[in-house]
Amino acid sequence: MRNQIFRTVKEWLLDSGFNIILDDENRRILIIEKEAHGIKNMILIVSDSILIMEQFLFEVKNPTEKIYKTLLQKNRDIVHGAFVLDNTGRRVIFRDTLPTDNMAQNEVMASINSLGILVGEFTNEMIEMSK
């Protein structure tokens, strides 16, 4: 019963055409991709209470206030999830979380698809920020 949520999420991902690169049911981690939609090495951590989704996007080589301001402003446009920074403050990651108690497939797919939309709309800016 403990891993039922994990198995359900995995089934939803497969039904939606995602490639599962890593499937570690013991640690409850999945790594998925669907490169045509901007999803590559997205990590999903499935606990009893929350689903965490993260994907590294780029590293800021020359950090400026303008770059961080742009990221924060773009967060407002992201339907699900947000830009976050790692401990160094240079690695930009997309992150979203969902409570698992009443989680539905459409919520998980909406969160993941939000990243695909973000990548499509913001690619040029992300490339510039990573220079």
Give names to the regions the model predicted.
Residues M1-I39, D77, V84-D86:
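Charge-rich, low-complexity N-terminal segments
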Residues R27-L30, I50-L51, R90-V92:
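Hydrophobic residues embedded in beta-strands of well-ordered beta-sheets
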Residues K34-E59:
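Long, continuous compositionally biased terminal/linker segments
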Residues L44-S49, E107-N113:
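Extended Gly/Ser/Thr-rich low-complexity repeat segments
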Residues I52-R91, T97:
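Short, internal acidic amphipathic alpha-helical interface segments
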Residues H80, V84-A110, N124-K131:
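Well-ordered alpha/beta subsegment
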Residues I117:
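Long, contiguous binding/interaction regions
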